[in-house]
Amino acid sequence: MDDQDPGGISPLQQMVASGAGAVVTSLFMTPLDVVKVRLQSQRPSATSELTTPSRFWSLSYTKSSSALQSPGKCLLYCNGVLEPLYLCPNGTRCATWFQDPTRFTGTLDAFVKIVRHEGTRTLWSGLPATLVMTVPATAIYFTAYDQLKAFLCGQSLTSDLYAPMVAGALARMGTVTVVSPLELVRTKLQAQHVSYRELASSVQAAVTQGGWRSLWLGWGPTALRDVPFSALYWFNYELVKSWLSGLRPKDQTSVGISFVAGGISGMVAATLTLPFDVVKTQRQMSLGAVEAVRVKPPRVDSTWLLLRRIRAESGTRGLFAGFLPRIIKAAPSCAIMISTYEFGKSFFQRLNQEQPLGR
């Protein structure tokens, strides 16, 4: 905060507390994030209209490998499970080669099939990229939120009621812009289970074809998901925490109250912003498309057009694909993160009271 008293904490201490919370949350919640991404990147039907141009935008292709002896055939990485799907060069399906990718019918089914066919470690695929992204991003985000909220309230730029909403939105906007390339990499690792060498080749191909701007593919829907999520989350969190705390002073809010308030707020915000999360996942899955079957990668459609397309192909239900794992993830992850952060702040507050800042 701007004016520190002996019981306050410094921005550096805020960053340490939030960074620790990010590590704990990532270790516990990455499996649910992997399942959510798999369900969202899965197409409505693996065997229907595979060659319709509108379906190519969400798929990633690779050129023929030694596994394909006949010229002109290609291996299609479909639905994020790396199971082969063979197509003739003219786009005609060849049933004699066709191997239907594993389909997930729900959250539990996805957990079981991923563990059975790919191993338990796959549930933590993308964890290194997740930690590299979330630890600094969370540290910046939470520290920026506290600093912005204190500034807005201190300067009377907005009411105390709406200060959390404004501060949360602004803090998240900056964070999304900085970490968007790493978010894209993490999504690719989780959805397609590719090696880091294959991922590097995919990123290099994308930069060659679309320039450095391609690394921010999905920034629009990510911002549309995360900025409103942040605004809704902090607004509801402060309200619920205040209601649960009652007459308890704000600086004495228990970790338990923070846990419950964070879980409730995360659940509400995640539900309202889920359609944008689906669009973000589908758009980022188009990274690395090449002309493996003489199909030129289509132009990137707008977020609203993709929302309409998903609804047309999969119905309203398609806009809420991965609802259960996202909610199951959002509630505990928000609860774990905010309670760990509040615990860390309380720890540093006690430490600073025993040894005042500046000594």
Swiss-Prot record:
Localisation per UniProt entry: Mitochondrion inner membrane
InterPro entries according to UniProt: Mitochondrial_sb/sol_carrier, Mt_carrier_dom_sf, Mtm1-like
Chain positions recorded as [2Fe-2S] cluster binding sites: 74, 78, 88, 94
Disruption phenotype: Embryonic lethality at dpc 13.5. Embryos are pale due to a severely anemic phenotype. Conditional deletion in the erythroid lineage also leads to severe anemia, characterized by a complete absence of Ter119(+) cells, iron overload and increased apoptosis in fetal liver cells. Cells lacking both Slc25a39 and Slc25a40 show defects in the activity and stability of proteins containing iron-sulfur clusters.
Gene Ontology CC: mitochondrial inner membrane; mitochondrion
An example molecular function term from Gene Ontology annotations: metal ion binding
Protein name (Swiss-Prot/TrEMBL): Mitochondrial glutathione transporter SLC25A39
Protein's organism: Mus musculus (Mouse)
Classification lineage: Eukaryota, Metazoa, Chordata, Craniata, Vertebrata
